[in-house]
């Protein structure tokens, strides 16, 4: 694969740059602005990759890879399991690559995973293992998903936040849908 959870950051960046026929310094990576991502951020800086840090909205952050106008090439890091499933559902509609792996902080989490039928606690899940059929995703922005820190000031926001126009509240909703049909 081009990008893989088991590859180093350097290998993933190098593979992506080669695929896009560009230099790592022309790539933009998006991550949640969290202390747990310090090592990843340091490695990206060493490779001279442009970095966009967002304060929250990991689903929105993941979606920034879906279209060129968002100017994000890769979203990576550690986030929540439910958010990963939501991001996978949305990215499925854009034919994007996604991998995820559970990280268990407590024995209670492992027990809950086993109760849900998960037997391999180290398993790397491909998008097709997370989303196994039709995929519909809707997202309405309540808060802004603009970068908290970025060395690329041209990154575009995914959705506009709620606007108050004389007590009429306007929202913008992103809807993605991928339905599989059969000839049977």
Question: What kind of region is each of these model predictions?
Answer:
Residues 19-24, 43-46, 65-70, 127-132, ...:
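Solvent-exposed alpha-helices and their adjacent loops that cap or buttress functional pockets
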Residues 55-59, 72, 79, 83-113:
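Gly/Ser/Thr-rich active-site loops/lids in small-molecule metabolic enzymes
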Residues 31-32, 51-55, 77-78, 138-139:
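General beta-strand structural signal in soluble alpha/beta enzymes
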Residues 180-184:
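Conserved small/polar residues in nucleotide/adenosyl-binding loops
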Residues 40-44, 64-67, 86-91, 148-152:
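Short acidic, glycine/serine/threonine-rich loops at helix termini
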Residues 109-142, 147:
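A two-mode feature
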Residues 1-53, 174:
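Acidic beta-strand-loop-alpha-helix segment within the catalytic core
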Residues 138-162:
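A conserved acidic, glycine/proline-rich C-terminal tail/linker
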């Amino acid at each position: 694969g081009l990008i893989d959870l088991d590859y180093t950051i350097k290998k993933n960046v190098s593979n992506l740059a080669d695929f896009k026929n560009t230099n790592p310094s022309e790539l933009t990576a998006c991550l949640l602005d969290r202390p747990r991502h310090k090592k990843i951020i340091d490695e990206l800086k060493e490779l001279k990759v442009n970095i966009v840090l967002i304060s929250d909205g990991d689903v929105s952050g993941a979606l920034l890879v879906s279209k060129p106008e968002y100017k994000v090439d890769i979203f990576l890091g550690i986030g929540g399991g439910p958010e990963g499933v939501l991001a996978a559902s949305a990215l499925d509609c854009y034919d994007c690559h996604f991998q995820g792996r559970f990280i268990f902080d407590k024995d209670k989490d492992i027990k809950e995973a086993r109760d849900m039928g998960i037997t391999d606690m180290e398993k790397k899940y491909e998008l097709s293992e997370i989303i196994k059929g039709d995929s519909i995703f809707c997202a309405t922005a309540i808060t802004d998903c603009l970068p908290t820190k970025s060395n690329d000031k041209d990154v575009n926001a995914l959705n506009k936040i709620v606007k108050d126009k004389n007590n009429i509240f306007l929202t913008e909703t992103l809807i993605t849908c991928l339905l599989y049909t059969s000839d049977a």
